[in-house]
Amino acid sequence: MSTRPPLLLVGHGTRSDAGVAEFTRLVGQVRARTGGRVPAVDGGFIELARPSVADAVVGLVAARSGGPGRIVAVPLVLTAAGHGKGDIPAALARELVRHPGLSYRYGRPLGPHPVLQNILAARIDTALAGAPRRDTHVVLVGRGSTDPDANAEIAKVTRLLWEGRGYGGAEFCFISLAEPSVPAALHRAVLLGARRIVVAPYFLFPGVLPDRVVTQSREFAAGHPRLEVAVAGLIGACDELAGLVLERYDEALGGDIRMNCDTCAYRVALPGFTDKVGRPQVPHYHPGDEAHRHAADIHAAHHDATQHHAANIDDHPGHRHDHAVHEHAAHEVLS
């Protein structure tokens, strides 16, 4: 019998049935890849969809004969933005209050990672349908964030994707909350001489924002009839992604987590973002959640849990943000 802790996959949430189904599919793929070396694997969302994080934690706790114990939580986010730095830890802190004796180790975001670059390249090749890379400009579309560190990472991912793959050019942009926009990036590619563009959405699963990427790309193409524009598929649930999730699990369990906090807006007063330092973080609530009536108690408990977080590095190795001072990151409420 395995003595390793259960694995909790944490997603943001979406109202897209296809997005929920793809998340569920990935949870199943991760479970299958463990080969029994992880006693239990489950997943939940912090908002907008079921199962919630609370639902998943209840299941993992019930699966343990010796009580709550320890779990490993891996955030299914591509960049270390507000969800990964604040919203998900806040949701997990709430579960520490609900389940006395529960502790967790927190994995780092999935990206950037060579596995993701390879998946993106494969999706782009499918969209190219045999057309040469050298005549193709790639436009990578990130979600967009009020966290400059996360936005900068999209630029880094774009460069890593371009390096050594022979594309004619590569641009980055965002679908919400940040500039440049998708049309602006497409226009820049045209000014640089692009005649064929593949738009690559940097998203895990279907949802409102990926759909918006497709719509805006098609609208731009309609206004430029001599330009060939294709949209690559999403990263999606796949064996490669499941393997990366388990790599993050092993990192968290072994204490080998390497996060650079030097440009984190929640920790460092960056120009134009100083208001992010010093604001408390609170979890999202699902409709009908009984705990919503006790938000003040949970919020206070989160601050208590933060002290535990800082003091008990064994349970949260390498992840040393002070979540008590994280701002609740602005984001679009998606339908």
PLM feature spans:
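Active-site-proximal alpha-helix that buttresses catalytic centers in soluble enzyme cores
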Residues: 1-335
